[in-house]
Design a protein with these regions (language model features):
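Bacterial Sec-dependent N-terminal signal peptides
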Residues: 1-14
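Boundary/entry segment of secreted carbohydrate-active catalytic domains
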Residues: 14-49
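Hydrophobic faces of well-ordered beta-strands that scaffold small-molecule active sites
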Residues: 19-23, 58-60, 99-103, 152-156, ...
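Acidic-and-aromatic substrate-binding clefts and catalytic sites of carbohydrate-active enzymes
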Residues: 29-30, 34-41, 65-69, 75-83, ...
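Aromatic-rich peripheral "rim/lid" segments of glycoside hydrolase catalytic domains that contact
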Residues: 31, 253-260, 273-356
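Glycoside hydrolase catalytic-domain groove-lining segments
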Residues: 40, 44-47, 180, 191, ...
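Substrate-binding cleft and catalytic face of glycoside hydrolase catalytic domains
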Residues: 49-201, 205-209
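Structural recognition of alpha->loop->beta junctions
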Residues: 127, 134, 142-152, 222-233, ...
């Protein structure tokens, strides 16, 4: 009996493993009548089917006022305002899954190359911008909570290694300068999260998994300034962030230096084609995997094998898995990194390898 109790306690102590993806474009595909299919060609209702396949968390991005985004960005899928996000989160919760909310703090894409300040905050002083981050985060979360869709995980910023809310919050992540302003913004966002959603966990998301020195310095600077968050979130794409063993070493190092912080791969994906892809250009990684259906599958196999080695890794999320141009196109051009074939709508072989 004692042995059984010890075994039960050990099992219960294991961190929950999250599996999911950022499917922020799903309502746009639904409006077009897009049909998703399993690998045998059977039509499925996507969210309930993902739940059946073992997914338990869906990531959703939120822009401040996406109507202010350039048309080119809208053509790429920038449309997720608060009302859109609430509707999608209601679908996710109805399907029995949890929500990760991804605050971009921008009217358009926020990533390493750009962290544009929302139009309404452009003339703000650093302190006024800090106050705006707090008020906006708080108001957004209150609206989600009132709609019955409190997010279980909350990202305060998206791929913010180079800072956020440029130019005010821009920084060089290899140096200490600039982190005071960034951390002022982060603390404001995290404070709002704690107040409105005290049971939710907060993620700080960076995208330099292939560069240990920058990753180490970044999270050390946050620790030095006592930023209150729970989870280290990383992007990992093989075309930009070196090999999977390199990712594994970064995870080991983070687990050693920040043992109190679980780690999640909050974005990952790999190409299966460059067909009709206006963005690909030099995004090749033939040194690791061929750009093919089999290459995408093999990447997924090896990624999951690596992540299973690390107890401190508690989640992995595919970015834009719902891409499916088999009916009507939603974006101008195909990214070809999703988990459904753009011609047939069938689940890709990689989908069935993407599991714990």
């Amino acid at each position: 009996m004692m042995l059984l109790m010890v075994m039960t306690m050990t099992v219960n102590a294991q961190p929950k493993k999250y599996l999911g993806g950022d499917i922020s474009m799903l309502p746009s595909y639904q409006e077009k009548g897009t049909v998703y299919r399993d690998d045998e060609g059977k039509a499925v209702e996507l969210l309930p089917w993902l739940k059946q396949q073992g997914w338990n968390m869906i990531r959703v991005r939120l822009f401040v006022e996406p109507e202010n985004a350039p048309q080119a960005n809208k053509d790429e899928g920038v449309c997720q305002d608060l009302n859109y996000v609430i509707g999608l989160c209601q679908q996710i919760k109805k399907a029995g899954m949890q929500v990760m909310l991804d605050f971009h703090y921008s009217d358009t894409w926020a990533d390493p190359a750009k962290q544009f300040t929302p139009k309404r905050w452009k003339e703000c002083s650093p302190q006024a911008m800090t106050d705006s981050v707090y008020a906006y985060t708080r108001a957004s979360l209150i609206a989600l909570k009132k709609a019955g869709v409190t997010p279980e995980l909350i990202q305060v910023g998206n791929e913010i290694t180079n800072g956020m809310l440029w130019p005010t919050g821009k920084l060089d992540p290899s140096k200490a300068e600039g982190f005071n302003t960034l951390c002022q913004f982060l603390k404001a966002g995290c404070k709002a999260c704690r107040e409105v959603c005290p049971l939710s966990q907060i993620i700080i998301h960076t995208e330099k998994a292939g560069d240990w020195d920058i990753t180490r310095n970044y999270y050390q600077q946050l620790r030095n300034r006592q930023v209150d968050y729970d989870i280290i979130g990383l992007s990992y794409y093989p075309m930009w962030h070196k090999s999977i063993p390199n990712l594994g070493q970064t995870i080991k190092n983070l687990s050693r230096l920040f043992p109190e912080k679980p780690i999640m791969i909050v974005e990952t994906a790999a190409y299966y084609s460059h067909e009709n892809d206006p963005w690909a250009k030099e995004d090749t990684y033939a040194e690791f995997y061929p750009i093919s259906v089999e290459g995408q599958r093999q990447f997924t196999v090896e990624l999951m094998e690596e992540l299973r080695k690390h107890q401190n890794v508690t989640g992995v999320f595919w970015w834009f898995p719902e891409e499916n141009a088999s009916g009507s196109e939603v974006t101008k051009g195909w990214l070809n990194r999703g988990l459904f074939d753009n011609h047939t709508g069938r689940a890709m072989p990689a989908f069935y390898e993407f599991r714990w």
